[in-house]
Amino acid sequence: MAHPIRKTHPLLKIINGSFVDLPTPSNISYLWNFGSLLGICLITQIATGLFLAMHYTADTSSAFSSVVHICRDVNYGWLVRNIHANGASFFFICIYLHIGRGLYYGSYMYKETWNIGVILLFLVMATAFVGYVLPWGQMSFWGATVITNLLSAVPYMGDSLVQWIWGGFSVDKATLTRFFAFHFLFPFLIVGASILHLLFLHETGSNNPTGISSNTDKLPFHPYFSYKDTLGFLIMLMMLTLLSMLSPNLLGDPDNFTPANPLVTPPHIQPEWYFLFAYAILRSIPNKLGGVLALLASIMILMLIPMIHTSKQRSLTFRPMTQFLFWLMVSNTLILTWIGGQPVEQPFIEIGQAASILYFLLFIIFMPLSGWWENKLMKW
């Protein structure tokens, strides 16, 4: 009997093993869609970004006007630009939901997959940061100045490091040019890391909502989950199109409609909404180096989670106490996001500091303690 070509062709059999005949747990919910949605986000961002790069000029004197030119004179340039800008927001919505699902259902126990995922998060954040500088508006310029300046907190070599990143003594033409180069390069690194992420995931197979082995009950990925994913694609792309058409500037900063001016500081310097939680943690520590370390720790803490998992159960499905702590962590992160967008004054300073302390306590102490306590209760 002849085998289908998809099972014998050297290239097609890799695709077949990943997207067609892949054994998938029968009970995974729509929360497992976000990985494929992130793939679609990445493809959309690379495609729209490529067309934007064809018309963009990475020069301080013409960057802002080149973006205006794209929106006014290029055929459907306004749409490509709006989809690219709002696509970044959808990328982060999907990535945070994807991480949240991983935390809730214990997917972090696949350590290699999880750690590559955290590296991917860093890469996506770096890409979004350098991309935000490119339109060369007020918030682009001052955001770049403030965030790159944080490197001056590095002992001994901080100032040299900042000037090396800037390519001079301030954020200027050299900075913009290299940020454009980085913004073009990083998505391809993300594609490479995503392939590794999938490679390691397919070594173990997917987790499922119960957190127990599903080897006795698997389905082929196609047609069941390929159609399930397609519904997710349609919903997300429809929402992205609606936002880009009807309210394209909803998630942006009005300050970025003003060309960059090194002589005028905006009243509130803040990053895009998806970085506000980390920005709030950074601001809650009065010491510069301490703030930078806390900022890094707020993301790096994800790598620690597999090591401090104490429960005998993998998922939170049957762990009500840790479930409460998980939702407390989600609420706390939303509070930090709100605080990050507020001015540095009373009572926001205290709220930010309390939320920052709780953020780290939940991950490092409360959740492991709760897992240990639930183990004890199981013996009764």
From Swiss-Prot:
Its cofactor is heme b. Heme b b562 binds at residues 84, 183. The keyword Cell membrane does not apply. It is found in: Mitochondrion inner membrane. Its main location: mitochondrion. Binds 2 heme b groups non-covalently. One of its GO terms (cellular component) is mitochondrial inner membrane. It comes from the Eukaryota. GO terms for biological process: mitochondrial electron transport, ubiquinol to cytochrome c. Component of the ubiquinol-cytochrome c reductase complex (complex III or cytochrome b-c1 complex) that is part of the mitochondrial respiratory chain. The b-c1 complex mediates electron transfer from ubiquinol to cytochrome c. Contributes to the generation of a proton gradient across the mitochondrial membrane that is then used for ATP synthesis. The cytochrome bc1 complex contains 3 respiratory subunits (MT-CYB, CYC1 and UQCRFS1), 2 core proteins (UQCRC1 and UQCRC2) and probably 6 low-molecular weight proteins. This is Cytochrome b. It comes from Ranodon sibiricus.
